[in-house]
Amino acid sequence: FQPNAALPYEFNGGCYASPLTEDFPVMYYRTDIFEELGLTPPKTWEEFYEVVSVLQHNNMTAGVPNMQEDDTTGMSVYTAMYAILLSQMGGSYMKDDLTATYFDSPEGVEAFKMWTGFYSMYGLPYQFDFFNRFRTGEMPLGFAAYTIYNKLAMSAPEIKGMWEMLPIPGLENSDGSIRNQTVSGGMAMLMLKNTENPEQAWDFMDWFSGDEAQVSYGLAIESLLGAAGRYNPANRNAFLRLPWSVKQQQNLLEQWDKCVYLPQVPGGYFIDRNLTNAFRQVVIMNKNPRETLLDYNKEINQEISRKRKEFHLD
């Protein structure tokens, strides 16, 4: 597994699940349309804005996901987008002791301004079906989970060979390197506390999450379903043995190595809810980004504090 892959399942010194699958956002672009317009895929956000300008002048647009949720991972894509920008700016999602969010930090505020600015300043759509718009060419650039590859490979044969997936854009350092972290989510295995056969259950979990079982499972699914069944194991060794092309594998590994994992805390359900509320207030109601984020951040942290008291964690 990746070094911090179990972080979402850890709390207060305990680990409550074992990673099974993993998914993270990458950048998709239509190579045919980019070639026609003389564009190159953006590596930084400045380049992204330049590409968006050209696309919009040609009655096209780009897709930055907002209020959607990926059913296969349960990962909230809008939370992911904010967390991506926050990580790239060097900020933290939570304080070190996990007692409060860090959205009121300078990096947190700047990331929120940038996130909402995609829609309020650059006019990008905040509700869209990326698969269909990407297929038709209306949205030849966008960010989505790498498992969307399965759907594109199976259900969009008319654009086969006309698209690629790359790491997402980032912020450029003074030395020319790019900070393009993304966030990862996935599914996990767990054992119930009152299981009758804990040793046998653990043996199964240990076996099924191992290299050979994960490779066999992934290849078996793909042999039945074709590319639509391409498996996304959290086991890195198993991933390396699945039938990705060399270029696809290199691009995915480059992004995977820069994945950030978000901790889960009691009251964490208030994070998604209030980030969404703050987003709507700014993008739809034209409220001030900084003041709006700080107001909703207080509500988030009040709920986290309330749940910590309820569970006697303080």
Q: Over which residues does each language-model region extend?
A:
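Paired acidic/hydrophobic, glycine-rich loop segments that form the ligand-binding mouth/hinge
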Residues: 140-145, 164
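A bilobed periplasmic-binding-protein/Venus flytrap-type ligand-binding module shared by bacterial periplasmic
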Residues: 28-31, 184-197
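Extracytoplasmic/periplasmic solute-binding protein
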Residues: 7-20, 25, 49-100, 139-141
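Hinge/lid segment of periplasmic solute-binding proteins
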Residues: 1-25, 40, 49, 77-78, ...
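Long, aromatic- and glycine/proline-rich binding clefts that accommodate carbohydrate-like moieties
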Residues: 166-170, 219-277, 281, 306-314
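Short amphipathic alpha-helical coupling segments at ligand-binding clamshell hinges
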Residues: 107-114, 187, 196-208, 216, ...
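Glycine-centered hinge/linker elements that transmit conformational signals in sensory
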Residues: 51-54, 96-126, 168-171
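Periplasmic-binding protein-like
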Residues: 162-190
